[in-house]
Structures are given as C-alpha cells and as structure tokens.
C-alpha cells in the first residue's frame, strides 16, 4: 500500500513532522509512506488562468496515485495552521485528488490535548463538498510531543505506540 504523509506545518522543528517520520519508519514493512511538504505552496489566490502552480500539481498527482493520506496537523489557537488551510485550498481548486480518498488525521502538540480541536476542524474541512475525503473515524492524538521522542526519533510512549498499532490494523480491516 502507498500512503502520502502530508506535513501540515511550515515549522522547521515540528513534532508533527517527527510523528509522520516515526509512522513512516514504524510501518515501513507494511506500507510505503512518502512524506510531502506543503510549506512552499504560494498563498492561495484564484489564478486568473485557472492553472495550479507546478509544486501543487506535483502534490495533487502524488495524492491521486496514493491509496490514502495521513495528515499531521499541529494546533494553533484551537485551529489548523494557515499553511495547511492554504494547501487544502490549492488541492481542491478545480481538482479533486482527495475525493473519497481515505484520510487519517494525526496531530501532535506540546500540551495535554494533542491537537484535538485542530483535528476536529480539519475533519470538517475535509468533509467540504470541494474536498469530500473519506475521513477515517479514528485519529491519533500525541500530547506532550516535546518529550514524546527519543534521540533516534522513536516514540517513547508505549501506550502511544500500541494505540497507533490498533488504529493501523483497524484501518486495514
């Protein structure tokens, strides 16, 4: 199976990117997970010629060719980051790569709630008629993410690893 791991932030030191890298490594024997950055997308503005920027088209193609998408979102002020909203606007402008595409939402945050409010908002956005992704019912919340990884980038929380395993197998069933 092939998945796209969409890094939903432009932060250089993101624990959401770390989480996606861990998922990529942890499930390497079960799936090919390619991490995709959105930080270089231009600010969305409906282009007069209706042409998408080349870097957006590349991501659209990767999503279309994937069996599913895993989106890692941080939470800023109870919301998804502007860069993620910007990317979703681009990949739903006249193209529909996420239409009925299975999407799993993950989120890491420094605090206790693990990006739960951003994940709720992201779920609503992904259900919009212009996107209409098949958002999976489960989501993975990683709280206290600054302390969640060891020096090798592995999760140190056994419960978090077990939860991720359960979600993975639930998704496969």
Can you say where each PLM-predicted feature lies in the sequence?
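Short helix/strand-capping connector loops at secondary-structure junctions
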Residues: 140-154
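Rossmann-like dinucleotide/phosphate-binding beta-alpha-beta segment
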Residues: 128-132, 168-173
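Short, proline-centered helix/strand-breaking motifs
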Residues: 73-74, 102, 173
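N-terminal beta1-alpha1-beta2 submodule of the flavodoxin-like/Rossmannoid cofactor-binding fold
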Residues: 1-94, 151-169
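Short, glycine-/small-residue-rich phosphate/pyrophosphate-handling segment
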Residues: 101-144
